[in-house]
């Protein structure tokens, strides 16, 4: 049963401290709607935008870096965890019910900002159409550094739980299986970007392919929304990974394998981890992961179907950037079909309103010609 929050005043600043040399930390926010709220399925875009607005209001230099589309993102954001139900074409958050939201930092620079941020948090997270009171915040993943992870005790076997749908990019497509090479490539990218201890990617991943075994797995898949545009097929569940006997021939890679497993709860797995995908924890669990609201699944399936139609059409006509444009057309049209205004869609996608208006007209025309 969901836990109903006791009414109490918002307490700020929150008495959270951690060492200044910290590079990795995770925070858990308790958010409480004061009334029943209704959101469109892609609400994680709003969480992402609110977080970046918080950064931008106090540190313009860090904000510019976080908006850089070329670099690995030194933070992750979860979706809301709690009682979320479908209500027509929207999802509903219930009044006075606690929802959990997780934010992690993957670099010293970001955690420095977070340390100052939690001392002066706003009382309300202003999610579109759903003001959420920030009731409390606590440390979810303890402060540490990359060096401390690397020097920690070797774990030859560990399990990973994938709490939110997780997917990888492979040859231009989504790949919804936790193959060790894909899993550790995901972690190594963050490690090489933020640890200051870069490792040869090809050599390590070849070692992973040869010596890392999946000893147990329990997985399921679902179609989900993926950030600002498109939909993906992602997996949830758990896997157990072990070093094979011959892995000891390269002990430094064995130690890195162990460290990257401990990094997983901080950095998440796969892509779109700043939009709620890939939430990962250590340990095994056979429990069913929280259901994705039906309306989110319906929208994700509609976006995927439209994307395939538009991709096929644009390739026939020789259009450039076919995949990207097809995904945008599909996302805009599907969200409009669900009742969202084009103005809201334009704001979420950070596109000019007139461009979005043109795209939805072109998408409808293309769809009609296919009928």
Stretches found by the model and what they are:
Residues 1-371:
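RNA-interacting cores
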């Amino acid at each position: 049963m969901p836990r109903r929050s006791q009414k109490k005043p918002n307490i700020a600043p929150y008495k959270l401290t951690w060492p200044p040399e910290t590079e990795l930390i995770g925070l858990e926010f308790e958010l409480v709607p004061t009334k029943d709220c209704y959101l469109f399925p892609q609400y994680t875009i709003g969480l992402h935008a609110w977080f970046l607005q918080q950064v931008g209001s106090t540190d313009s230099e860090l904000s510019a870096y976080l908006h850089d589309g070329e670099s690995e993102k030194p933070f992750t954001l979860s979706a809301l965890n709690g009682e979320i139900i479908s209500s027509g074409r929207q999802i509903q958050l219930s009044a006075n019910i606690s929802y959990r939201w997780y934010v992690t930092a993957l670099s010293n620079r970001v955690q420095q900002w977070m340390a100052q941020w939690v001392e002066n948090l706003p009382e309300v997270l202003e999610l579109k159409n759903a003001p959420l009171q920030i009731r409390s915040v606590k440390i979810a993943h303890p402060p540490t550094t990359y060096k401390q992870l690397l020097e920690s005790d070797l774990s030859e076997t560990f399990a990973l739980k994938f709490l939110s749908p997780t997917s990888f990019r492979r040859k231009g497509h989504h790949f919804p299986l936790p193959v060790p090479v894909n899993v550790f490539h995901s972690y190594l990218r963050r490690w090489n970007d933020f640890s200051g201890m870069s490792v040869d990617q090809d050599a390590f991943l070849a070692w992973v392919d040869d010596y890392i075994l999946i000893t147990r797995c329990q997985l399921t898949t679902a179609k989900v929304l993926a950030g600002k545009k498109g939909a993906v097929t992602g997996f949830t569940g758990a896997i157990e990974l072990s070093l094979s006997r011959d892995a000891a021939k390269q002990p430094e890679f064995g130690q890195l394998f162990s460290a990257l497993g401990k990094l997983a709860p901080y950095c998440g797995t796969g892509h779109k981890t700043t939009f709620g995908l890939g939430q990962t924890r250590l340990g095994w669990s056979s429990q069913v992961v929280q259901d994705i609201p039906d309306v989110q699944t319906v929208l994700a399936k509609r976006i995927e179907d439209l994307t395939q139609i538009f991709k096929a059409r644009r390739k026939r006509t020789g259009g450039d950037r076919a995949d990207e444009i097809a995904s945008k057309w599909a996302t805009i049209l599907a969200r409009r079909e669900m009742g969202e205004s084009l103005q809201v869609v334009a704001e979420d996608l950070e596109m000019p309103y007139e461009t979005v208006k043109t795209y939805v007209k072109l998408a409808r025309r293309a769809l009609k010609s296919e009928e």
